[in-house]
Structures are given as structure tokens and as C-alpha cells.
């Protein structure tokens, strides 16, 4: 089977491309720019085209050279030349959520949903099931050291009392209600907060979407939910198909303290993620001794409090790369960093992700950073320009919000040079090279391209 991916450099789409490569399919793909993700896929045998083209697959016009299926990222605009060509030729086209949804029907699927903690919890579950001999297929929105720095692991069916079962662990993203394409046997629901308000408009609509998602569970399905979540008392958690009720986990459980001691990754939020994983394992009757051993061995994942020690101009620094881009994620990451490095100076370099998120959650960003400053979770904060997400920004909102306005608001009550606006990654790197003395912790935070900041330290 020949499959072409439009937007193959995305973290989700690339995982699906890896899956089909492992399955022996002919994979091609395109994106706007090359990246370490596209280069890794090329090394695996995928044919990569940069940028998008009006031709498909190998670029040959002959019918037998055309792909059988085109899978595209939801971020790809409708007028994309490859998509237009595929539809004109009558080639089947599926969005990434639609394509992943088809897989969920073929597997015993465990879907991790929620505003925060999806990638880490999904990764933990994938690792634990692997250690327990369940040989799962895992499609996750980050790269895992345990899976050879890959965002995909392809497993095989295993024989259990019920017969042969194939397990699939996925992230169930709520963006644009993507998760409504998925049909899992187990749903993990971490937390629910206001996010993606450009699509949902308000929290009420977000809650409705999550409730609809839980209705996708079969009669013997299992809903595992966070008892500590402030929105847990909604009707979502009255799931009673065939008399079944949710299984809750909480930081008040006795296991919390043990997990806090054995986890390699810091932060109470990661203890919560581990509790969710432990609850899944117990639902699958995996012994606790295997679960705790697997969780103790978890090394973390790419851009999730990803710690590296580096030297720049003979200055030793600790770099923490983190994907956090929502006020709550920022809060828990800064708090965890201060707990881990109580005596070091902490610099936070934050790149807001998407104008609309920054606009709708502006007050929450201000509240979070003011609290972090008051509690000395950082010593210096640099905010760069907002990462512009192509195809998802409204011009009228772009005119209303900026990083300069965010910094001005943060400095309104007290201007002490602790919070700065520096527009670009390059200028930020140049500033840091000149001012860092060595020994500092530098947190690079955001879902855009801010993770590339260290590349500019040597230029």
C-alpha cells in the first residue's frame, strides 16, 4: 500500500508515518520545511518532499505511481495543492484524527485525554505495558528514549484468556474535537481546563465535547478519571453504561508518596500522571511490582521537562526544554524546577503559542507569571514574540494581542528588570550569551520553535 502524508513533519502525523513504515507500506510525505523529524523519516525509508508540491507521492504522473491513501495534518489548509490534486484524482483522503480513528477500531485502544499530561501519561502507559509483556503499539506526541527516540512503537498481538489481543495506546487530543474520531476501550481523563477557545469558545462547550467522547466507550469500557480535577463533578463523570462507574485516582492515595520518591521526573503533576498509569495497569490486572518498577525506570520524554547539561563559552548551564504553553502547564513546570533546583538562578524563556490562545487566556498568563515571580520560581523571565500558527490565526485578534503587551502588563505594578521582552530567538540567544555567568538553569518553554534556542548559542 502506498500512503502519502501532507504535513509529515508534525509530531502526530510523523508517528503515523512511522507506524505504516513499520507495517511495510510505501510512505512518502511533504512539509513546508525540513526538520529532524523529516530527516529521521527519510532515514527510515520515507520519500520526503520539501516544500509541498502539486504532484503526489513519487511525483510521477502514472496512475500506478500515485498513492492509495493521503493522510493530512489538520493544520494543512484546504487549498493545499497536494490535497486538491488528490481529491481531483479521487484518491481517498483522511485527516490525521480520522486515520488514527480507523486504527482505534482494530485494536484494544487505551486513549489518554485531558488538557494536560496526555503525552507523559501516554508514554508511561506505553512503557509499563511493554515491561508487562503486553507488546503495545504506541502513538504518542513526543519522542521517547525507551523507544529509541521515536514517537511510535509497533507491537504485535498477544494471547490472553480472551484470545489474541492487540493493544494500542494513543493521545486523544481535544483540539478541534479530534478525539471524537476515536473508539477506545479505556479512556484516561487527566484534567479539563479552558483551552483551544478559538474553537470551543467557552469551558461549557469543552465539557460537552469530553462528555461526548466518553460516550464512545463500549458497555464493558473503562473510564479512569482524576479525582483532583476541579471539573470532576460535572456530568462527564456519571458514566454508567451497563452500570459501570469511573475509576478515580487521586494524589491523596497512599501510593503518591512512593511514586514521588521513585520517579526520575519532578513535579506533583507527574505523580498524578503516574497514578493514572498505575490505575490503568490495575484495570488490566498487571501486578503492582511490575508497575512501580516500570515507572521508576521512566526517563522522561522530548520537550517534557527534558534536562540537559551543556557548556557555552566554558559556562556550564542546565537547560530544561519544556512543551508547556498553557498557564497551568507553565505554573507546574516552574514550580517543579524551583523544587529541583532550590539554590540555582532560574531563567525562563517563554514563547507564547498562537495569538488566539494568548488573547483568550491573557489574564491567566498574567496571573501565572505574577504568582511565579512572587514565589521566586524564576529569577528572570524573557518572553519572545508569539509563535504564529499558520492557518489558525484571526487577523483582528493578532492586532489585539502581543508579547510586548503581555510584558507591559506584567511590569505594570513593579518594573524591576526581572521580566523582559526580546522579540526573536536569535536576539534572545545573543543576550543570554552575554549575561549568563554559569551555573544557571535555563527553562526553554513553549510549543513552537523555541526549543531551537540552544542552536543559536554557537552562532
Where does each model-flagged region fall?
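ATP-dependent carboxylate-amine ligase
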Residues: 1-47, 56-66, 70, 88-91, ...
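Short N-terminal binding/cap micro-motifs at the start of the first secondary-structure element
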Residues: 12-15, 146-147, 272
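Beta-strand->loop->alpha-helix junctions that form or flank phosphate-binding loops
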Residues: 30-32, 49-53, 94-101, 139-142, ...
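Short pre-catalytic strand/loop immediately N-terminal to key active-site residues, enriched for Gly-Thr
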Residues: 261-267, 317-321
Amino acid at each position: 500500500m502506498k500512503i502519502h502524508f501532507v504535513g509529515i513533519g508534525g509530531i502526530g502525523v510523523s508517528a503515523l508515518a512511522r507506524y505504516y513504515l513499520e507495517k511495510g507500506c510505501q510512505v512518502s510525505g511533504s512539509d513546508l520545511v525540513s526538520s529532524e523529524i523529516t530527516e529521521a523519516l527519510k532515514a527510515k525509508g520515507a520519500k520526503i518532499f520539501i516544500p509541498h508540491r502539486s504532484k503526489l507521492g513519487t511525483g510521477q504522473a502514472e496512475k500506478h505511481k500515485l498513492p492509495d491513501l493521503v493522510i493530512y495534518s489538520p493544520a494543512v489548509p484546504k487549498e493545499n495543492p497536494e490535497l486538491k490534486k488528490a481529491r481531483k484524482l479521487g484518491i481517498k483522503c483522511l485527516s490525521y484524527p480520522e486515520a488514527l480513528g480507523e486504527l482505534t477500531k482494530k485494536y484494544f485502544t487505551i486513549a489518554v485525554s485531558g488538557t494536560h499530561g496526555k503525552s507523559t501519561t501516554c508514554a508511561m502507559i506505553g512503557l509499563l505495558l511493554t515491561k508487562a509483556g503486553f507488546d503495545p503499539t504506541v502513538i504518542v506526541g513526543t519522542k521517547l528514549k525507551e523507544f529509541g527516540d521515536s514517537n511510535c512503537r509497533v507491537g504485535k498481538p498477544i494471547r490472553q484468556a480472551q484470545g489474541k489481543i492487540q493493544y494500542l495506546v494513543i493521545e486523544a487530543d481535544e483540539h478541534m474535537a479530534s478525539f471524537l474520531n476515536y473508539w477506545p476501550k479505556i479512556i484516561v481523563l487527566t484534567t479539563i481546563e479552558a483551552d483551544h477557545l478559538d474553537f470551543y469558545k467557552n469551558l461549557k462547550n469543552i465539557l460537552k465535547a469530553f462528555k461526548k467522547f466518553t460516550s464512545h466507550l463500549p458497555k464493558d469500557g473503562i473510564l479512569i478519571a482524576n479525582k483532583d480535577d476541579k471539573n470532576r463533578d460535572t456530568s462527564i463523570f456519571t458514566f454508567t453504561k451497563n452500570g459501570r462507574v469511573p475509576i478515580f485516582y487521586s494524589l491523596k492515595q497512599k501510593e503518591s508518596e512512593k511514586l514521588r520518591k521513585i520517579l526520575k521526573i519532578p513535579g506533583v503533576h507527574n505523580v498524578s500522571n503516574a497514578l493514572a498509569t498505575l490505575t490503568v495497569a490495575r484495570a488490566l490486572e498487571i501486578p503492582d511490582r511490575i508497575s512501580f518498577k516500570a515507572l521508576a525506570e521512566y526517563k522522561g520524554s522530548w520537550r517534557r521537562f527534558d534536562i540537559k547539561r551543556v557548556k557555552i563559552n566554558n559556562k556550564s548551564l542546565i537547560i530544561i526544554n519544556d512543551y508547556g504553553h498553557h498557564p497551568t502547564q507553565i505554573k507546574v513546570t516552574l514550580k517543579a524546577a524551583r523544587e529541583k533546583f532550590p539554590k540555582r538562578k532560574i531563567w525562563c524563556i517563554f514563547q507564547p503559542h498562537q495569538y488566539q490562545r494568548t488573547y483568550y487566556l491573557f489574564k491567566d498568563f498574567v496571573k501565572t507569571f505574577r504568582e511565579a515571580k512572587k514565589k521566586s520560581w524564576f529569577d528572570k523571565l524573557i518572553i519572545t514574540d508569539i509563535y504564529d500558527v499558520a492557518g489558525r490565526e484571526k487577523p483582528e485578534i493578532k492586532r489585539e494581542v502581543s508579547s510586548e503587551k503581555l510584558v507591559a502588563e506584567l511590569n505594570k505594578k513593579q518594573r524591576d528588570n526581572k521580566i523582559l521582552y526580546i522579540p526573536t530567538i536569535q536576539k534572545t540567544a545573543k543576550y543570554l550569551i552575554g549575561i549568563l555567568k554559569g551555573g544557571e538553569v535555563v527553562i526553554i518553554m513553549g510549543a513552537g520553535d523555541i526549543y531551537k534556542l540552544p542552536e543559536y548559542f554557537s552562532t
